[in-house]
UniProtKB/Swiss-Prot annotation:
The lineage of its organism: Eukaryota, Metazoa, Chordata, Craniata, Vertebrata. This is Cleavage and polyadenylation specificity factor subunit 7. The modification Phosphothreonine is found at residue 203. It is found in: Nucleus; Cytoplasm. It comes from the Eukaryota. Residues 33-69, 176-220, 409-471 are annotated as: Disordered. Residues 50-62 have a biased composition (Pro residues).
Amino acid sequence: MSEGVDLIDIYADEEFNQDPEFNNTDQIDLYDDVLTATSQPSDDRSSSTEPPPPVRQEPSPKPNNKTPAILYTYSGLRNRRAAVYVGSFSWWTTDQQLIQVIRSIGVYDVVELKFAENRANGQSKGYAEVVVASENSVHKLLELLPGKVLNGEKVDVRPATRQNLSQFEAQARKRECVRVPRGGIPPRAHSRDSSDSADGRATPSENLVPSSARVDKPPSVLPYFNRPPSALPLMGLPPPPIPPPPPLSSSFGVPPPPPGIHYQHLMPPPPRLPPHLAVPPPGAIPPALHLNPAFFPPPNATVGPPPDTYMKASAPYNHHGSRDSGPPPSTVSEAEFEDIMKRNRAISSSAISKAVSGASAGDYSDAIETLLTAIAVIKQSRVANDERCRVLISSLKDCLHGIEAKSYSVGASGSSSRKRHRSRERSPSRSRESSRRHRDLLHNEDRHDDYFQERNREHERHRDRERDRHH
């Protein structure tokens, strides 16, 4: 029978009599030596020369007694993994580099390698969990790996406990706060604050990602949302040359943007146009024209309080006392602005195409008149002071200068030698006079209407002279 409630006698409910000749009272249970001596493990196995201890008569346990407990014993590594935390390395350290350092101390049984990563951007936090196959490897890692240099920094090794995990997490937060960009490329952790979870501390199941999911690639620069404008120099770019733009006026129907958002993709242009925008090719629209002009004032305009209308802040010629050649100030909605700009682009493209075609056919007068008409129409539009309109006008003027130079170089040459002779006599003086007039009038935008009328009279006189010459 069994002793106490800690063990189970598997033969308590049935008799172990295999031969009916033996009497139950005379039977010696071979299992009594084991079951009755559990309190003294050293007496489990008795010598064959010693007589068996007498069978103690004890009452059998009641049927409704307490359920006996089953005991289990385990070895040291059967219930937990052999793992350590390795940290204090740089965020761009790869799993292959870490494994090479581990193998350099004689540990080759690495089972798993998990990097702690930011959930926001997938960047390493600078520590990892290393799982090995034996306790001996754990001792080697704890004794030999600390102090090893990995990417210029000495690694730190600690047992894989919750307390050490919290310490490595705190170190990772401090490193993110004081990290300096290397080579002008800021780490991705600077794209947002170093708070990865609701309670401020990341859990191992959330931040320890298997090494197979890590992709070693150069860091990318993300927009600096939720960061103050002072974080802009971290990008390796010079500070903006002009102050931040004023908020949008109420005439646009759009509320001003929140002050905490920094529009990196809408960086303001430099105060003066670069060389490739000074003389663009005919019909080409220079880059960076997709920016909304409402966010950035023109380069030659003084940044002040929000203007009441769209046009008042961009009138650079009124302080000279001359009349305003632009359209009267008026409010322009965003949809109307885009519609006018689309129409101006179509006018500019059509005029340049027609002028180039006419100049190729030798009809320089019509080509020049077409370009002058397009310039006048765009200047009279309600968004003429916008930077994009000025670029369109500049393209038209460049095309006009090219056609005029070609027309005066050709002159009034015809098929007969007499016409060529008379052209040589008259062309130099007329060419110099007309070129000087064109330069003076084109650079003075306030006299554009007078210039247009003067050009018409000049063309009429030229046609009269040609008609008289033929007659």
